[in-house]
Amino acid sequence: MNSLERYKMLSNEDKSNLTIYSIYDSIYDVAKNEDINISDDIVTDIKELAYDLYLDDEYMNLSASQIAFFLTECYAKDNSFMDKVADMDYSDILQAIDNDNYDFYKDEMER
């Protein structure tokens, strides 16, 4: 049995744990590369938003790690980012991720 077949046999819980791990890994990579400290509360907020967006993504097929990377990059550039996107529509955030539009939430705030 090859590794792909073994992966397909994982339980839903194990698959979820792998997704959460990939989200944490992306947050860690950005924080390390940007040399920033992110509080546990913000890490949890980014993780939860990334996971919710990943589950909500029906059309763009974005990976959980890609979503987490984008959100963490936005936070690294503007530490008020999470507050600013708290009430935004998920489709707007997903579209921004797909377009690599790191300033999308600024446009929303100006409206």
What do the PLM-derived regions correspond to, one by one?
Residues 21-110:
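Acidic, low-complexity, intrinsically disordered interaction modules
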Residues 1-13, 19:
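Extreme N-terminal leader/activation tails
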Residues 1, 110-111:
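Gram-positive cell-envelope targeting signals
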